Amino acid sequence: MVRDGTTKSRIKRDIEFLYEIGTLKNTERSWQQFMGSGCASVPEHTFRVMFLALLIARGEKFDDEEKIIKMALVHDVAETRTGDANYLAAVYVTRDEKRAAADTFLGTAFADLYRDVLEEYEERKTSASKIVKDADNLDVDIELKEMEERGSIIARKMEPSRKLIRAKKLYTNTAKKIWDELQKANPASWHLKANKWVKMENAGK
């Protein structure tokens, strides 16, 4: 039971925050301008980034997995207020993501995530921040492969720019190894080859 006004007020602010981050499912990724429909939403992108970041962290023997998960979870939170900006729009549009993120977390139970985690990510100086940024980039490559599997021609045309990302932007050796394997991987093999891992004697009967 809530007894004091300060705590009750804070809970109201936390609920506002929960509604705000819920709107990310309605926030379009701006590269949809180039790729057409079918792009992952911000929360869908964030979900896989968390697993990618954990995968890279384990490959790099980085032990603070709690920080990795928190950082991946909040890395795009500012987009509730700024929206997304693709690589071309970013040349012309200035977004105050730092202020947007600070204001989003202001007065909530999660204010420490901005102060202790998100600022670190944006500065890109620590191992954790580099791991999460690598995950952010790799999710784009995975999604492009999924789009290509569905017949997207523009996804194939993005290959030269993604090779440049691999050469110039990926920080960790683990991320580079994952990128290299992605070029050979079949997005459908997880279910097409399921019998290799799972006994399904009654399949097709």
What are these regions (language model features)?
Residues 1-205:
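Alpha-helical, largely C-terminal catalytic domains
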